[in-house]
Amino acid sequence: MREIVHLQTGQCGNQIGAAFWQTISGEHGLDGSGVYNGTSDLQLERMNVYFNEASGNKYVPRAVLVDLEPGTMDAVRAGPFGQLFRPDNFVFGQSGAGNNWAKGHYTEGAELVDQVLDVVRREAEACDCLQGFQITHSLGGGTGAGMGTLLISKIREEFPDRMMATFSVVPSPKVSDTVVEPYNATLSVHQLVENSDETFCIDNEALYEICMRTLKLSNPSYGDLNHLVSAVMSGVTTCLRFPGQLNSDLRKLAVNMVPFPRLHFFMVGFAPLTSRGAHSFRAVTVPELTQQMYDPKNMMAASDFRNGRYLTCSAIFRGKVSMKEVEDQMRNVQNKNSAYFVEWIPNNVQTALCSIPPRGLKMSSTFVGNSTSIQELFKRVGDQFTAMFRRKAFLHWYTGEGMDEMEFTEAESNMNDLVHEYQQYQDASISEGEEEYEEEQQLENEE
């Protein structure tokens, strides 16, 4: 079976990761200690994509939990699903990275990284046919951003031909955790552009908006935000965990979604959005799902796709859905919004189906889009980065850990290049676009 090894690093990564495991354990009929008491064989059929089977009908997540301070790990351990994880897979330091990317990437994190890689290796060896890795982390802090990207590059070295998917929480425009967020995020994007195969961008502010606007929660907690993220993660990984007619795995998703290797930053959305505990009291139809799924208010990253164009996108429908209806609706959306799709990639919408809906819903859909408007997000961080870097504000925290200013300049220009690349393909018309696309294809064929 095509297994996936999951890593969660830093406070944010561990909290999102914990929510993810809670969600998929529920979908597979596992209780808080990993014992199976589900109702359907379908829950078991592909259990081993994410779980190892232990003795006594118990299943253990193939997860590695990493942090540079013990706090969040203790919270995960004390949580409702704390007994699920294998105790040896908790790897933590004592010192913390203090929101400093350099500490996570070069000093504190580098000391811990071999220990983590041992655990990763052990998990990878227990797999029949490892498909790839997924990592949850944030880009604004020290551990998730600095050490997370260090782990990604180390795993890349050791498993060059396996997929690397990241669920990355990007800094949001208005809600900021720390002053040095723009530094940490830019340095991280610099790494992700080179080392990740697919990055699902999530941002707290967009999640807040969804909670307040759509779910009518007056003051959403991180629990509510994480619940949304875990719904998307569960949706994106559905096809891997349940048999379906139109299955996709990480690699298929990447092949369909990434037209140029550097442009692999996706926006995600989920429908129907219901608040925790409030299962919907009305039937949802495929047209409604499609409608809500393509709604800009539904995107979990603060960039509006109407300011750019979709290179590619993918929709995953779950539940008892008629194949024909889905195709019709998707065609419908494309015709209605044809201005927002680039015309030089024909059939750039991919659909996958899975017959098992999430808990408490009859049907749902998950949306993954590769839109050029994601550049807004990088632009925003880039502007904040430039403002501080021009004055060399806060730099001593990084140079003190042995970093060089040159590295900052490199990261900045790499991110600016990324923005320009997105812009270039957004402006490309069918005549010039096809030539470039064909050139790319020729180059790839020659390789």
UniProtKB/Swiss-Prot annotation:
Stretch list, region Disordered: 427-447
GO annotation terms (biological process): microtubule-based process
GO function term, MF aspect, one: GTPase activity
A Pfam family per the record: Tubulin
Chief location bin: cytoplasm
PROSITE patterns: TUBULIN, TUBULIN_B_AUTOREG
Biased composition (Acidic residues): 432-447
GO cellular component: cytoplasm; microtubule
Co-factor requirement: Mg(2+)
SUPFAM superfamilies per UniProt: Tubulin C-terminal domain-like, Tubulin nucleotide-binding domain-like
Binding of GTP, residues: Q11, E69, S138, G142, T143, G144, N204, N226
Signal peptide start-end: none
Family: Belongs to the tubulin family.
Assembly information from the UniProt record: Dimer of alpha and beta chains. A typical microtubule is a hollow water-filled tube with an outer diameter of 25 nm and an inner diameter of 15 nM. Alpha-beta heterodimers associate head-to-tail to form protofilaments running lengthwise along the microtubule wall with the beta-tubulin subunit facing the microtubule plus end conferring a structural polarity. Microtubules usually have 13 protofilaments but different protofilament numbers can be found in some organisms and specialized cells.
Job of this protein: Tubulin is the major constituent of microtubules, a cylinder consisting of laterally associated linear protofilaments composed of alpha- and beta-tubulin heterodimers. Microtubules grow by the addition of GTP-tubulin dimers to the microtubule end, where a stabilizing cap forms. Below the cap, tubulin dimers are in GDP-bound state, owing to GTPase activity of alpha-tubulin.
Name under which the protein is recorded: Tubulin beta-2 chain
Species for this entry: Erysiphe pisi (Pea powdery mildew)
Gene: TUB2
